């Protein structure tokens, strides 16, 4: 298994709407690497574009440990509906290290998605899992938590965001010069 590099705010792939996954043949290897990467970074969720992959795929483990079996895999997900009261909760993001913002989201979400075996499901999720699903679906649509808060909150982290953006541009230039 491999730990993949997590790309940060400022990398163009994070602002793209991710493509549907058509071929599930090698998906388990990618999923395994994504879980390794997420656990290494001490996250509870990870979208494929956060590791540089343009695909509608994300994983979640709200237990935050490798030992527990609370893993969730969502392929070609789309939000069918959002229900319940809006709730405010502090969210962080592996692509925006050091930044945590109070984000308002609906209490529950209904998601249509595929599993790695190709089966389609439509389920309702609430609590931390429901919130994490909404967060990761935002990633797959090019949306960050910073886009979900007001201007006053965004200004508080302006310096950190500019630094992340600058570092991402430098990393992309370096990779380009090396032929990646």
List the model feature ranges, each with a label.
Residues 1-180:
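Positively charged
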